[in-house]
């Protein structure tokens, strides 16, 4: 098994591509850069430059609350391909899968908390950003088969510096670069 993994890594380095060691290593869906130095991943790689049309009509997959610096509430939406794959637990995600993460400032609800008599209700405040992951294993081979997009609430694309943080973080996720799971 170890020799198989080493051969796959060596082949990936030689061809300058990306290899998903998911099946060979038993680590379902992990992504690995092909060559040393590819860890920056998103630098120089193509990005998602336009928000997909109709994404607000997609199906909800999950909701997340982020503490720390982000302190946000987010909802994860998926197109039909991503939604079906996530529900079925299909890894890796098929090409054509698109995920949209809509992030909002996490705020206390004064109105709700007056009813409850204590601070316990958090709601989505102002939108902070919209992020996309588009699966195209050929176009985005340098970043695990995923293209990343980051947009302001009014649709302006993110900076190269913002986009450069996407792949290094997502390659650590054990489900083909996706942190979230389907929530029925």
What are these regions (language model features)?
Residues 1-9:
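Bacterial N-terminal signal peptides that target proteins for export
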Residues 71-84:
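Short, structured beta-strand/loop micro-motifs enriched in basic residues and often containing a Trp
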Residues 2, 22-23:
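Basic polycationic patches enriched in arginine
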Residues 9-10, 89:
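Exposed boundary/loop context
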Residues 11-22:
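Hydrophobic alpha-helical membrane-insertion segments, chiefly the h-region
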Residues 43, 81-88:
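Short acidic, Pro/Gly- and aromatic-enriched capping/linker segments at domain boundaries
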Residues 5, 26-37, 45-70, 90-184:
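Sequence context surrounding c-type heme c attachment/ligation sites in exported
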